Amino acid sequence: MGSRKSTMTFIEESARNLPPLAFTPQPMDFDHPPVDPVAECERWFAEAWRLPTPNPNAMTLATSTTRGVPSARTVLLKAFDAHGAVFFTNRESRKGEELRANPVAEVLFHWDQLGRQLRIAGAVTELDDADSDAYFATRPRDSQIGAWASDQSRPLESRETLLGRVMASIERYDGSDVPRPAHWGGYRIALDTIEFWQAHPFRIHDRVVYRRSGTNWLTTRLFP
């Protein structure tokens, strides 16, 4: 259609020389999906944790304003069970503000070596102080200091300003434990929707989505 010649430069898809896996992942039967998607998530996580790559628990977290304006960033999964997927962050950040106003979110895991994607979406709730305190106590001290020094997502005049705040926090808590800031804590994303995606040659991928219905799951296979 039309006579205009495209001037776009496209990213070429070339064969990627990924290192071979040291184990054989167990394939999922997309024709007969498992009854329990939570157990299948845990199996996929267990296999991803065996990858020779850093942060296999990294996930893209998507939130939005009440007007539907989206934003996304990478966070780390810190706990997972039948109640949901847990991560921690500054609650006064942009994502914290959006979750307070519009408490729903979706996360996406992408494990290139396994040819897999996993999506989890649902309502979001804040963890209580006890759980947030317990996790904060396990963090490296430098990370604890950073939680005090950074007004996440706020304008910053210079890096020197940030480093000055880091030094001030180091001096403030010299010789004592670093307490959890009141503005820092955990969130849990309910498992309302779970989608499994497995790559195959020529884009003939497998997809299956689970949607919670009361205490049951409705399963639908999707075109790729």
Role assignments for model-derived ranges:
Residues G2-P224:
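Binding-site signature for planar aromatic cofactors or substrates
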